[in-house]
Amino acid sequence: MRMTLITALVLQAIARGYRFGFQIVDVTGYPTGTVYPALRRLEHAGFVRSEWEHEGTATKEARPQRRYYELTPPGARALDGAREHIRTIGSLRPIVPKTAQ
């Protein structure tokens, strides 16, 4: 799976304890139309797994059921790789072009 900024941010949000979709939308600042497809791709790739909460909990709180996401070991490794890639990019120095002589 190609690691994009949004997929890395979604993985990071899940790793930090934001477990259901709207929490992830809030913390990343991306719209639902971006976050939910990313969650589906991450789940399909095996980087996250999801489970619906117990229906009784949602009913008791008078809201729709939430789907909770959890980072898998491959997802944790992918996130570590993305973080390392970002650190590497951050350490690059800009190339200053030589002026014509």
Where are the language model's segments positioned?
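N-terminal helix-turn-helix DNA-binding core of bacterial DNA-binding proteins
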Residues: 1-36
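Short, charged/polar surface micro-motifs in flexible loops or helix N-caps
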Residues: 16-17, 44-45, 75-77
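Basic amphipathic alpha-helical segments that dock to polyanions
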Residues: 35-45
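Beta-hairpin "wing" of winged helix-turn-helix
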Residues: 45-62
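Exposed loop/turn and edge beta-strand positions of beta-sandwich/beta-sheet ligand-binding modules
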Residues: 65
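Amphipathic alpha-helical dimerization/coiled-coil segments
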Residues: 73-101
